[in-house]
């Protein structure tokens, strides 16, 4: 997994003061990272246009232009007059190297931005408020085949809020380390592929300790059956309580069985199970089992059962969906449980604990709110769903950006609850269960050719093939 930071000012300051890497060295390495991206995505001789701003982000662009000129048809548009000392220095160096630099004329109709690669080096991490009208990157980038953002696409602020005219990159090179603003739900459509641009020193030397991490494909640890002398009891008993909409719980149960649980049982609370809708591989119980490894409640549920508090004492659990609308869920916040709400459900839970905020406030501050909640309830693991999933525990937050839009379909969350339950029943810690189930869920969604057609049962089949 990769370290994530809200800002990297402290990292740059340390690199300069402790590692004796000057601003010039850092900027040259940033330009080299951008240069590698151009070389990987365009042939020699291709037309490359670089949009440069007035600060150090613009300086990166001018340094890049100097490195490309002679091998590519390189053109720089000066979107704003160079102001920072490093930007001015890099602009002069670019001019001396023969780079063509044109002033961008806001009202000029004949400026041709058709190119093979368009690179945004305009604002970077200093964006606040709204973009100036002439910086409408949606129209500026229409004729570019491939678009690269330097550090942060212009129009995304430090909280991950996005201006409607923001630069929509195919690739973002985050300089030095990953910034948290690039991982917001709203930024997902603007960042494209995300890579780190190393600034002249190995990233683990450049970085400082952090409480925020980005999950990678390599972090997934699938269930392992490495013993030959074993039986079903060695792999846990997972129990799913079915609500009024029984299909949701049945999906969770099938998902848990497919992810390694030795036994999966179900119990109807608000529904009636007939012989026509009984999956043969599940064990159907009339009562809550005395011996079990973990249970899940909430999928398709309308009311909290009266024995809920007693069940919390018997085994670890996954709580989802319907439970977050009932005050009885508060009993679980002092137990080792995994909560898996989507934003609307999380708002309801926050209201129950006395935090009244709007959906807009939640989406604008999702990372901070999830972290604060996990610190207030240290026994709980919170998995907050969204375009990017947040997993928070005791102040640490793990961000999963691996999933696809294919998961935006009823039943996907029920499958996820089942995956978490399965790992919990197999003696994974609650945090490891949430992280690995979320990763498997996301990666399986990428295996489907047509993202509009994925069904929950298809998803379970793909999970079996990981």
Curated annotation (Swiss-Prot):
Residues covered by region (ADP-dependent (S)-NAD(P)H-hydrate dehydratase): 215-466
Domain YjeF C-terminal: 215-466
A GO biological process held by the record: metabolite repair
Binding site for ADP: 385-389, 404-413
Catalytic activity: (6S)-NADHX + ADP = AMP + phosphate + NADH + H(+); (6S)-NADPHX + ADP = AMP + phosphate + NADPH + H(+); (6R)-NADHX = (6S)-NADHX; (6R)-NADPHX = (6S)-NADPHX
Classification via SUPFAM superfamilies: Ribokinase-like, YjeF N-terminal domain-like
Residue numbers binding (6S)-NADPHX 1: 151
Region (NADPHX 2) residue spans: 342-348
Entry binding sites for K(+): 57, 120, 154
Cofactor annotation: K(+)
Segments for region (NADPHX 1): 56-60, 124-130
Assigned protein family: In the N-terminal section; belongs to the NnrE/AIBP family.
Name of protein: Bifunctional NAD(P)H-hydrate repair enzyme Nnr
Organism: Helicobacter pylori (strain ATCC 700392 / 26695)
Taxonomy of the source species: Bacteria, Pseudomonadati, Campylobacterota, Epsilonproteobacteria, Campylobacterales
Gene: nnr
């Amino acid at each position: 997994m990769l370290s994530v930071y809200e800002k990297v000012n402290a990292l740059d300051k340390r690199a300069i003061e402790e590692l004796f890497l000057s601003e010039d060295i850092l900027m040259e390495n940033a330009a080299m990272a951008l240069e590698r991206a151009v070389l990987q995505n365009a042939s020699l001789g291709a037309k490359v246009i670089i949009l440069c701003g007035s600060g150090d982000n613009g300086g990166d662009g001018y340094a890049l232009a100097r490195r490309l000129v002679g091998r590519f048809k390189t053109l720089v548009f000066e979107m704003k007059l160079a102001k920072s000392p490093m930007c001015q220095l890099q602009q002069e160096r670019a001019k001396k190297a023969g780079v063509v630099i044109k002033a961008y004329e806001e009202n000029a109709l004949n400026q041709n931005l058709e190119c093979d690669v368009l690179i945004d080096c305009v604002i970077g991490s200093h964006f606040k408020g709204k973009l100036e009208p002439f910086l409408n990157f949606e129209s500026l980038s229409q004729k570019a085949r491939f678009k690269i953002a330097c550090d942060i696409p212009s129009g995304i602020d430090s909280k991950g809020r996005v201006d409607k005219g923001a630069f929509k990159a195919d690739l973002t090179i985050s300089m030095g380390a990953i910034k948290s603003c690039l991982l917001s739900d709203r930024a997902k459509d603007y960042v494209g592929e995300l890579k780190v641009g190393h600034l002249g020193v190995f990233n683990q030397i450049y970085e400082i300790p952090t409480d925020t991490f980005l999950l990678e494909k390599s972090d997934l640890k699938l269930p392992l059956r490495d013993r030959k002398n074993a039986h079903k009891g060695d792999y846990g008993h997972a129990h799913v309580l079915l609500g009024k909409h029984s299909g949701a719980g049945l999906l969770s149960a099938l998902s848990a069985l497919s992810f390694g649980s030795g036994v999966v049982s179900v119990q109807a609370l608000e529904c009636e199970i007939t012989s026509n809708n009984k999956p043969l591989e599940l064990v159907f119980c009339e009562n809550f089992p005395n011996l079990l490894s973990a249970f899940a409640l909430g999928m398709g549920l309308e009311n909290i059962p009266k024995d809920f508090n007693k069940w919390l004492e018997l085994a670890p659990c996954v709580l989802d969906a319907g439970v977050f609308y009932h005050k009885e869920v508060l009993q679980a916040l002092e137990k080792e449980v995994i909560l898996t709400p989507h934003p609307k459900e999380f708002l309801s839970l926050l209201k129950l604990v006395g935090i009244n905020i709007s959906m807009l406030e939640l989406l604008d501050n999702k990372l901070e709110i999830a972290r604060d909640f996990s610190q207030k309830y240290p026994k709980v693991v919170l998995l907050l769903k969204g375009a990017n999933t947040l997993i928070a525990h005791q102040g640490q937050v793990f961000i999963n950006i691996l999933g696809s839009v294919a998961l935006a379909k009823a039943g996907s969350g029920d499958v996820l609850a089942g995956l978490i339950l399965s790992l919990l029943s197999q003696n994974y810690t609650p945090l490891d269960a949430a992280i690995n189930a979320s990763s498997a869920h996301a990666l399986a969604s990428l295996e489907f050719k047509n993202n509009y057609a994925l069904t929950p049962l298809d998803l379970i089949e793909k999970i079996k093939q990981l």
